[in-house]
Amino acid sequence: MPTIPSGRSLLDSDVLLRRAGLTIDMHYADFGAGMLGHFVLPACEIVGPGGEVYAVDILKEALQSVESRAQMENVTNLHIVWGDFERSGGVKIPAGSLHIISFVNVARVLMKSSVPIEEAKRLLRENGRVLVVDWKPGIGSIIVDEQRRVRSDAVHKLFVEHGFHLLEAFDAGPQHWGLIFKLSTA
């Protein structure tokens, strides 16, 4: 029976965050943080005590799980944000305060509406970045159905249409693609 890769063997969040440019003293948010804090907890370590990290999710149970893990690990620079990035103004983080936002395994949400991208624009600082990571289509897996996978070129097109430019497209792991965008300045 084949093994199912997990943790860093599937998606190394530390490597991806650093690739996106996350460094000491930055402010970062993960939109759709999920139950494990797979991106926010490594981000807390990368940005250090002078930085701020926001775990954003609409599911309170997911946020409670992340908060419990953060408390066990004595993380002090993590903010739990119950919010809806699919609604304009739905994320209660100060406008223009974030250096980097990530959307991990939520590309299907991005394809339904431009609101998440506009919400990211509202919250990003000038020259802010967005990291988008999702499942590659056409790679057989029992983890995620093929119908739930989104092509990276479709996401690329959406972000460009909303004032971002692509900095990098890359393989984010054995079953994931990654895109890094920068908010274009007028």
Model-identified regions with their sequence ranges:
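Conserved alpha-helix/loop element of class I SAM-dependent methyltransferases that forms part
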Residues: 7-27, 38, 42
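A generic structural signal for alpha->beta connector loops
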Residues: 19, 25, 50, 75-77, ...
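A short acidic, Gly/Pro-enriched loop at the edge of an enzyme's catalytic core
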Residues: 23-26, 86-101
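Class I SAM-dependent methyltransferase SAM/SAH-binding core
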Residues: 27-90
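A short glycine-rich, Lys/Arg-flanked "PGG" loop and its adjoining helix->strand segment in the class I
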Residues: 44-48, 114-129
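A short SAM/SAH-binding and catalytic strip from SAM-dependent methyltransferases
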Residues: 98-113
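Conserved class I S-adenosyl-L-methionine
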Residues: 129-158
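Core SAM-dependent methyltransferase catalytic element
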Residues: 162-186
